């Protein structure tokens, strides 16, 4: 008989283990049921109770990621086409930012002293819209107006139209300079907030990116956290074939950035990398996401041209429907364990 995850996430279970179980035994038990217990640990109630909360938080971010993926798929199939691949590769990063890391207020999107987000790869707007809707910035019904006349959700982000969008982007490269300016302004005001700049690997074809990076590094803007979505593909092919970027991490290090690489679909790794980035002083910081374009749905991951997908035949629509059903079934199974 399957044991529900809620049983393992219950603090009472961990209190029992603190008194009656070894940490080694607890590792084996949780791993058997698909949960992870970090090491090393002391075998005491306080620390094991903290792990219960960490597992709960991780599960909530995983569920948020699944909901964002569903929203992206459903809004694009309703629209008939859209930028799927690069939106899906950023799902986990957006979930970590808005689900945990950002100092923002959905009820007050223009909060004066808030963290700022710049999605320089503006064609990935659907992942931003889905995240904002899930976090309560606007009604989810708006998602089905994507790129339609009179919409508040244009194909590329527009700060004058969408609550929660801090900068208009879409012309590749320009968001990097905008983020550099915003971070400079934050520093001049003495703000302790951060600017999160998300850039695509294909976008690095634009020279403006490197001009902005040089400025960010030279001015040691450690409050501007650069996140590069290295999903290996762009509009017209693989990045290595269009204009080989060689080693993006080496380039960023050479520019003066404290740089690390994490798996782009690993929530815990992304979250930990952002924590480490915030701890860096007197140096610009960059996180390179080793990500998968179209991530989360094998059919779309394997699609050769998944930058922009047309939902205009039975096969593609059928795969979208199957993916949504699978994600919804997983949420229905896992979400009860996270309800307080």
Tell me what each language-model feature is.
Residues 65-81, 229-231:
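N-terminal capping segment at the start of a domain
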Residues 29-52:
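Short, Lys/Arg-enriched N-terminal segments with co-localized hydrophobic residues
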Residues 267, 273-340:
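Glycine/aspartate-rich loop-and-adjacent alpha/beta segment that forms the canonical ThDP
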Residues 115-117, 193-197, 224, 283-291:
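Generic beta-sheet signal
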Residues 164, 168-280:
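Thiamine diphosphate
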Residues 72-75, 87-218:
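Cofactor-binding active-site loop characterized by glycine-rich and histidine/acidic residues
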């Amino acid at each position: 008989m399957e044991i529900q995850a809620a049983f393992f996430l219950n603090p009472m279970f961990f209190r029992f283990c603190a008194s009656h179980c070894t940490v080694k035994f607890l590792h084996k038990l949780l791993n058997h049921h698909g949960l992870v217990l970090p090491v090393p640990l002391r075998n005491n109630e306080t620390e094991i109770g903290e792990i219960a909360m960490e597992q709960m938080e991780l599960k909530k971010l995983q569920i948020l990621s699944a909901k964002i993926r569903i929203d992206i798929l459903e809004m694009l199939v309703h629209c008939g086409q859209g930028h799927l691949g690069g939106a899906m590769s950023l799902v986990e990063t957006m979930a970590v930012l808005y689900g945990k890391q950002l100092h923002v207020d959905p009820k007050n999107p223009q909060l004066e002293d808030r963290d700022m987000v710049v999605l320089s790869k503006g064609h990935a707007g659907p992942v931003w819209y889905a995240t904002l809707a899930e976090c309560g910035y606007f009604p989810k019904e708006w998602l089905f107006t994507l790129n339609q006349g009179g919409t508040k959700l244009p194909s590329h982000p527009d700060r004058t139209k969408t609550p929660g969008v801090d900068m208009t982007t879409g012309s590749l490269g320009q968001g990097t300079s905008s983020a550099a300016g915003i971070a400079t302004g934050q520093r001049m005001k003495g703000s302790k907030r951060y600017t999160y700049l998300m850039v695509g690997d294909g976008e690095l074809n634009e020279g403006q990116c490197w001009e902005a990076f040089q400025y960010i590094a030279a001015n040691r803007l450690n409050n501007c956290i650069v996140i590069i979505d290295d999903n290996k593909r762009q509009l017209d092919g693989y990045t290595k074939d269009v204009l080989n970027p060689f080693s993006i991490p080496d380039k960023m290090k050479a520019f003066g950035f404290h740089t690390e690489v994490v798996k782009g679909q690993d929530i815990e790794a992304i979250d930990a990398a952002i924590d480490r980035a915030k701890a860096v002083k007197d140096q610009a910081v960059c996180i390179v996401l080793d990500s998968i374009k179209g991530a989360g749905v094998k059919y779309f991951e394997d699609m050769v041209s998944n930058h922009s997908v047309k939902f205009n035949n039975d096969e593609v629509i059928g795969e979208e429907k199957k993916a949504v059903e699978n994600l919804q079934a997983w949420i229905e199974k896992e979400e009860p364990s996270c309800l307080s």
